[in-house]
């Protein structure tokens, strides 16, 4: 067999099937587009569902791809086995109603055994088939010439996921030889068994039946082929290494981890797990971020965060206790660049996101471990179980992974109350799901809508008023002829000027009706077959199917939306110009009142950057650029520099919104005719929505003017209160007042210290010796809650070897602070003192072993709390 690089195997596979008349389907982003059923693209066929289910017809019925994929259903196995991965590449060839079993098997055999391609030894190949698939057996045995002894019948060789296409499959195995195990059926040492000797290299699925609702199977009118070959596994065979991790896809990463850690791979089995986890997870994280995912606390973002934190935990077992994962991104980019340039193109952004996450997790670990250690102590003193509520709070409030809580609890021979934890998690999911319920409300109607094939033409680019016809009315999930006033309905027009919500632009609102009835249109979405689906309330009369109507869009709202949408394009271009090409749209909202734009950028924008972006947008508005809308081929659009939104799928003909030379972007939305119509652009806020994502909210036109007018009014009020005449004097006057306040506060603080000192007398005389420890636990007078910290500083300077606990009250609120000399923290911890004391005063608190703070709401319990401190130390 030929020894080849992974990149060579990938290219040979694609070249082979192109020779066989296949069309290359480019690898799709890992974040699914328009497929809510998937968290990630998890297979080669996942991106081709549109062809298999008939939604789209491919240019050619023969397709080949190398699709990057993520599977996270068994994360905990990654690192402990030879071939488990969260990120992998699936090579696949597919036939949509074209060739079938004979060609699929012949193609596979030729690619594997021909010297021109993989050059595998035929005698090392075995296959499995379904026992009843006599056709596959005949092809393998008679046409290919495979001995009957190398064709194994296995009942499980049938691809079936329930209702829908299904069929038998044949798997091809490579025998790596007796070095990987002697033949022994008792140990499953045979093709298809759980062993390291016979490796599955290719799975050919023959979709020839439809699995019906009544669990019967009927032949499909169009039979399909769906195959999959794991690139990592094939590479390990070609390079003759024991596991996928020793291939050129992983070893450069592992070599760098060796360099950073000073440890060696393949010396210690437990240590090897850490190397594998890091090498696998950094590939997944790098590609996922490059494809638009970002670490977060839910959904795919949580998967990324979990993977990164798992890798960091394993890196600590190699002695790496600082952020370093981000340094591996360039290595991943170099390995994968021949076919996936995206990681290298976005490497700086990816590294910044990962580094920030690593830094935050190291902080989280430190803080979370302190809290977890207290929970472990409590569990040991009670029922040996960490409460589910506490574990959830640790996860939800501090971001401490539940997996790590379980792991550390197990090390202490404790368990975690997971049922309660899961119950808390489910309640959190339920809260999140409430926000999504509206988007699912049409599922009842969807079966009706699927059957509506009539076209509905959108005429809203040219007009806001149009004479049309109601072709369909849906009420309570059923298609009806008439609906009375007061009811909410969904309906379709033969032609409509109403824009359906899309690309961040909200739907048009307005009215549809005639002399007999009127419908107030409140929303417009896309129906399953592409028509604009209007939602509205019948205002008067009886809405009737096939009625001729006047469709009128709210013109004022439309005009404001146009301004905000065109301004969004200018904003996007300005952000790229000012911040860099890594900026990509991560979400947008264009509505009449304002615009909101989410974009990928690491860290808050400076005020200077915000001002510059705002100025650039306004400059393009004042240049009065004609906005040209053109339809052209995707290739032509790219040639003129049109910006496409990352991850979006575009057809052969695209709509280009051209504000050249500043902004050229693919877009289906509605825009102004000239940028001067926008009038004015004003950013009102810049904030973060998650790791690596920033959000700008802005106003245009009249809204921007009114906002500035309000600011000017407030400024003039401030000027009047400050009693200054010139605008330029305002800042100087404020600075003067701030300095005066600072001086007065210092004087007040000094006076309070003097008063406290006089009242306290000689504080050294108040120190008690408790359990051979010097202790001062007392109440002090403070003017405000913050003053207790400065009071403590004074006490500490005089009593450096003393445990000090101070309590003060202001307006019925209690403030507590404790310090313990670092030399004594092995005996008593400030955090423990505060944590156990504050419940007495109706509060809570905590902190480090040497310093902690807290508060409460029951000043009448201060004496009791101070007595508790002394008793606590006495009983240590």
Swiss-Prot record:
Catalytic activity, EC:
6.1.1.7
- UniProt entry keywords in alphabetical sequence: Aminoacyl-tRNA synthetase, ATP-binding, Cytoplasm, Ligase, Metal-binding, Nucleotide-binding, Protein biosynthesis, RNA-binding, tRNA-binding, Zinc
Write down how the cofactor binds this protein: Binds 1 zinc ion per subunit.
Q: Name one GO molecular function term.
A: ATP binding
Task: Write out the GO biological process terms.
Answer: alanyl-tRNA aminoacylation
Q: Which reaction does it catalyse?
A: tRNA(Ala) + L-alanine + ATP = L-alanyl-tRNA(Ala) + AMP + diphosphate
Give compartment(s).
Answer: Cytoplasm
Cofactors required: Zn(2+)
> Is the keyword Transmembrane helix in the record?
no
Q: Please state the protein's primary subcellular location.
A: cytoplasm
Enzyme class, spelled out? ligase
Q: Which residues bind Zn(2+)?
A: 565, 569, 667, 671
The record's Pfam families line, in alphabetical order, gives: DHHA1, tRNA-synt_2c, tRNA_SAD
GO terms under cellular component: cytosol
Extract the PANTHER family matched here.
Answer: ALANINE--TRNA LIGASE, CYTOPLASMIC, ALANYL-TRNA SYNTHETASE
- What does the similarity note say? Belongs to the class-II aminoacyl-tRNA synthetase family.
* NCBIfam families, per the entry: alaS (TIGR00344)
Domain comment?
Answer: Consists of three domains; the N-terminal catalytic domain, the editing domain and the C-terminal C-Ala domain. The editing domain removes incorrectly charged amino acids, while the C-Ala domain, along with tRNA(Ala), serves as a bridge to cooperatively bring together the editing and aminoacylation centers thus stimulating deacylation of misacylated tRNAs.
Functional summary from the UniProt entry = Catalyzes the attachment of alanine to tRNA(Ala) in a two-step reaction: alanine is first activated by ATP to form Ala-AMP and then transferred to the acceptor end of tRNA(Ala). Also edits incorrectly charged Ser-tRNA(Ala) and Gly-tRNA(Ala) via its editing domain.
Instruction: Indicate what this protein is called per its UniProt record.
Output: Alanine--tRNA ligase
Species annotation: Staphylococcus epidermidis (strain ATCC 35984 / DSM 28319 / BCRC 17069 / CCUG 31568 / BM 3577 / RP62A)
């Amino acid at each position: 067999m030929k020894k080849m690089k992974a990149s060579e195997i990938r290219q040979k596979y694609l070249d082979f099937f192109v020779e066989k008349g296949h069309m290359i389907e480019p690898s799709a982003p890992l974040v699914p587009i328009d497929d809510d059923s998937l968290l990630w693209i998890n297979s080669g066929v996942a991106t081709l569902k549109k062809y298999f289910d008939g939604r789209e017809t491919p240019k050619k019925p023969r397709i080949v791809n190398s699709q990057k994929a993520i599977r996270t259903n068994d994360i905990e196995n990654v690192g402990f086995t030879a071939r488990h991965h969260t990120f992998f590449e699936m090579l696949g060839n597919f036939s949509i109603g074209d060739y079938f079993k004979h060609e699929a098997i012949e193609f596979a055999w030729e690619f594997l055994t021909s010297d021109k391609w993989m050059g595998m030894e035929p005698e090392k190949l075995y296959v499995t088939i379904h026992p009843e698939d006599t056709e596959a057996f005949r092809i393998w045995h008679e046409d290919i010439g495979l001995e009957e002894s190398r064709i194994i019948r296995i009942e499980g060789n049938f691809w079936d996921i329930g209702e829908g296409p299904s069929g038998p499959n044949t798997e091809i195995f490579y025998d790596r030889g007796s070095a990987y195990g002697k033949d022994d059926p008792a140990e499953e040492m045979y093709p298809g068994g759980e062993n390291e000797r016979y490796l599955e290299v290719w799975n050919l699925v023959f979709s020839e039946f439809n699995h019906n609702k009544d669990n019967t199977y009927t032949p499909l009118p169009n039979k399909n082929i769906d195959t999959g070959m794991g690139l990592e596994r094939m590479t390990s065979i070609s390079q003759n290494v024991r596991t996928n991790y020793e291939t050129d896809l992983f070893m450069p990463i592992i070599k760098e981890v060796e360099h950073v850690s000073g440890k060696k791979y393949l010396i210690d089995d437990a240590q090897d797990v850490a190397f594998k986890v890091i090498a696998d997870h950094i590939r997944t994280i790098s590609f996922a971020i490059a494809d638009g995912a970002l670490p977060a606390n839910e959904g795919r973002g949580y998967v990324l965060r979990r993977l990164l934190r798992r890798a960091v935990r394993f890196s600590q077992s190699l002695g790496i206790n600082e952020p370093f994962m981000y340094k591996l991104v360039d290595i991943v980019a170099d390995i994968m660049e021949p076919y996936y340039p995206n990681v290298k193109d976005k490497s700086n952004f990816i590294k910044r996101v990962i580094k920030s996450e690593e830094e935050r997790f190291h902080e989280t670990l430190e803080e979370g471990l302190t809290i977890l250690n207290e929970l472990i102590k409590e569990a040991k003193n009670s029922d040996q179980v960490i409460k589910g509520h506490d574990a959830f709070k640790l996860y939800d409030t501090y971001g401490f992974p539940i997996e790590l809580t379980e792991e550390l609890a197990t090390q202490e021979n404790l368990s975690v109350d997971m049922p309660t934890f899961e119950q808390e998690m489910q309640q959190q999911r339920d809260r999140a799901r409430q926000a999504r319920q509206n988007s699912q409300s049409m599922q009842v109607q969807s079966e009706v809508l699927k059957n509506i094939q009539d076209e509905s033409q959108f005429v809203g680019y040219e007009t806001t008023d149009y004479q049309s016809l109601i072709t369909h009315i849906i009420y309570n999930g059923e298609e009806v002829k008439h609906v009375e006033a007061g009811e909410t309905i969904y309906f379709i027009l033969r032609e409509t000027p109403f824009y359906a919500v899309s690309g961040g632009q909200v739907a048009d609102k307005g009215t549809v009706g005639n002399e007999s009835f009127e419908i107030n249109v409140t929303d417009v979405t896309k129906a399953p077959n592409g028509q604009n689906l209007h939602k509205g309330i019948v205002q008067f009369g009886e809405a009737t199917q096939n009625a001729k109507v006047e469709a009128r869009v709210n013109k004022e709202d439309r005009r404001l939306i146009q301004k905000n949408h065109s301004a969004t394009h200018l904003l996007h271009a300005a952000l790229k110009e000012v911040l860099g090409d890594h900026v990509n749209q991560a979400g947008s909202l264009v509505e009449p009142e304002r615009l909101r734009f989410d974009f990928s950028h690491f860290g808050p924008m400076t005020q200077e950057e915000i001002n510059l972006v705002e100025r650039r947008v306004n400059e393009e508005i004042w240049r009065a650029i004609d906005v040209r809308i053109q339809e052209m081929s995707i290739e032509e659009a790219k040639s003129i520099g049109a910006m496409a939104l990352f991850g979006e799928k575009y057809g052969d003909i695209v709509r280009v919104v051209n504000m050249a030379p500043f902004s050229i972007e693919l877009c289906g939305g509605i825009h102004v005719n000239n940028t001067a119509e926008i009038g004015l652009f004003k950013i009102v806020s810049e904030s973060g929505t998650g790791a690596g994502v920033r959000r700008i909210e802005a106003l245009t036109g009249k809204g921007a003017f009114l906002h500035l007018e309000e600011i000017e009014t407030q400024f003039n009020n401030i000027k009047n209160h400050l009693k200054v005449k010139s605008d330029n004097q305002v800042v100087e006057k404020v600075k003067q007042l701030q300095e005066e306040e600072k001086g007065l506060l210092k004087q007040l603080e000094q006076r309070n210290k003097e008063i406290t000192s006089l009242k306290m007398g000689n504080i050294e005389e108040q120190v008690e010796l408790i359990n051979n420890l010097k202790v001062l636990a007392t109440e002090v007078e403070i003017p405000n809650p913050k003053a207790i910290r400065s009071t403590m500083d004074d006490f500490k300077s005089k009593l450096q070897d003393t445990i000090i606990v101070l309590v003060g009250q202001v307006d019925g609120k209690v403030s507590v602070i404790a310090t313990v000399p670092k030399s004594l923290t092995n005996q008593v911890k400030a955090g423990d003192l505060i944590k156990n004391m504050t419940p007495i005063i109706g509060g809570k608190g905590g902190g480090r072993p040497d310093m902690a703070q807290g508060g409460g709401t029951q000043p009448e319990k201060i004496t009791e709390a101070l007595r508790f401190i002394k008793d606590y130390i006495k009983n240590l």
